[in-house]
């Protein structure tokens, strides 16, 4: 009985501490993307309820990856997972229909500004080419094996309180692929109110961020990992022949991520549900970061001022 009481008490403490997330609803899980940034950035995103987060502005680059990946998955996937327990029943297989539907979802949200409006229209031709590049490279690796897309994986280490949840882009019985699309860049034309778009070059080495995400899927699936970058012209494949993709290095990166989450969880538990105390424990947001704190919603700007006393530079 005592053990039961203790567990109940502990559960309540956890619930109280994590109530800083999702407008009081708490946190169901960590994800790679939620833990890959500084804690301050996590707080000013995930402390808001989901319906509020959905209204936050984000530019064409995030949309580009979804447009390409979702289209390719529907074109060549044999199974697509909707949730961790539910697969898609059936889906459109015709390229034009898939692409237009995906584009429609993106365009439901108004562009952030004129520059973004231009980019969202112009990116379409780049996305079509990028779909072709992606489809080909995935097919070359998967060959005739059954291809599973968006497979949900969860994992929890040591004394972690919350699981890490992720979705694997492409999975077969032997391999998995983490696919990174490099969206085109947009630049202002000198002395004019116009913009131009150009292909973003592919990296020559895999980035630590992307390797860490790959390491999580590797630890969950134990399959042969591939990290692939694509743009509208070409692709580059990193597999286990690459020094940084070897088992030891992936494990090292995975446990580094776990350590970071364990630290965050200790801080959260220590602050017992006080967001302002937690904010004082972590480094204030670096407002000059090239992209972390651009395009903030008014609610987020207000929260930053409340928690850290930082006023927005206009």
Predicted features along the sequence, with ranges:
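Conserved catalytic cores of phosphodiester-cleaving nucleases, focusing on short active-site segments
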Residues: 68, 164-200, 217
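An active-site-proximal "capping" alpha-helix that borders the catalytic cofactor pocket
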Residues: 210-221
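Metal-dependent nuclease catalytic cores that hydrolyze phosphodiester bonds in DNA/RNA
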Residues: 1-167
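Active-site metal-coordination segments of metallo-dependent hydrolases
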Residues: 59-62, 202-211
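A structural signal for short, well-ordered beta-strand segments and their strand-loop junctions
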Residues: 148, 171-179, 225-229
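Metal-dependent nuclease catalytic regions and adjoining charged, substrate-binding loops involved
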Residues: 219-314
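Short, solvent-exposed loop/turn segments at secondary-structure junctions
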Residues: 154-156, 182-184, 231-235
């Amino acid at each position: 009985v005592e053990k039961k009481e203790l567990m109940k008490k502990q559960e309540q403490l956890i619930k109280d501490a994590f109530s800083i997330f999702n407008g009081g609803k708490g946190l169901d899980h960590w994800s790679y993307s939620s833990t890959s940034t500084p804690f301050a950035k996590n707080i000013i995103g995930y402390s808001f309820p989901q319906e509020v987060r959905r209204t936050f502005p984000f530019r064409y680059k995030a949309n580009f990856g979804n447009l390409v990946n979702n289209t390719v998955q529907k074109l060549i996937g044999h199974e697509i997972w909707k949730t961790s327990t539910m697969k898609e029943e059936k889906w459109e297989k015709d390229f034009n229909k898939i692409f237009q539907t995906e584009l429609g979802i993106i365009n439901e949200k108004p562009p952030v500004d004129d520059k973004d409006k231009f980019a969202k229209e112009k990116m379409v031709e780049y996305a079509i080419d990028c779909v072709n590049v992606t489809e080909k490279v995935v097919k070359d690796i998967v060959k005739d094996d059954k291809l599973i897309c968006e497979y949900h994986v969860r994992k929890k280490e040591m004394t972690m309180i919350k699981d890490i949840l992720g979705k694997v882009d492409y999975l077969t019985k032997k391999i998995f692929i983490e696919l990174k699309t490099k969206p085109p860049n947009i630049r202002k034309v000198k002395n004019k109110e116009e913009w131009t778009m150009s292909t973003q070059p592919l990296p020559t080495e895999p980035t630590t961020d992307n390797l860490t995400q790959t390491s999580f899927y590797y630890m969950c699936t134990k399959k042969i990992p591939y990290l692939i970058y694509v743009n509208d012209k070409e692709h580059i494949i990193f597999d286990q022949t690459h020094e940084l993709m070897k088992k030891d290095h992936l494990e090292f990166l995975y446990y580094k991520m776990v350590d970071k989450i364990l630290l965050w969880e200790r801080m959260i538990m220590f602050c017992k549900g006080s967001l302002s105390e937690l904010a004082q424990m972590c480094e204030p947001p670096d407002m000059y970061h090239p992209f972390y704190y651009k395009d903030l919603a008014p609610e987020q700007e207000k929260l930053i001022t409340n928690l850290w006393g930082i006023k927005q530079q206009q």
